[in-house]
Regions:
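Short S/T/G/P-rich N-terminal loop/turn motif that feeds into the first structured element of a domain
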Residues: 4-62, 66, 74-77, 112-125
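A short, amphipathic edge element
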Residues: 64-68, 103-106
Length: 125
């Protein structure tokens, strides 16, 4: 999801601020981790990958999605993207839109923080 975008869109810099604990009144958005592979089209357009990321980050920000970190990797996957979205539906919609552009294919997992995991564990009968 995090790397697709139209290279013609004006680019902006990613939010590189360090993660800080949210005030208790602020709702913490769910975190997602996407494992990304370039398609043949994505490989052909590899020189624009960072520009596409900046454009995509700006585009999805209006939907409440924040790309926290993007790593270009060696091995089975070409990228790992860590992002936050307001809910699963929003995450799914931006992932579908990114994949539809044809540069990438992704697998995405919902990630849980330690406090979220504590809440999950507390519900075990």
């Amino acid at each position: 999801m995090c790397f697709a975008g139209d290279p013609q869109i004006a680019t902006t810099k990613l939010d590189e601020s360090k993660s800080k604990a949210a005030p208790e009144t602020e709702k913490v958005k769910p975190t997602y981790i996407s494992l990304v592979k370039f398609t043949e089209k994505g490989i052909q357009n590899a020189k624009q990958t960072t520009q596409r990321l900046d454009a995509w980050a700006a585009k999805v920000q209006s939907m409440g999605v924040t790309i926290k970190q993007m790593y270009w990797t060696l091995g089975e996957y070409d990228q790992v993207c860590i992002f936050e979205a307001p809910d699963d539906e929003t995450a799914a919609s931006v992932l579908l839109a990114a994949n539809m552009l044809g540069n990438i294919r992704s697998q995405t997992m919902r990630a849980f923080t330690a406090p979220e995991m504590e809440k999950i564990l507390a519900k075990i009968p």
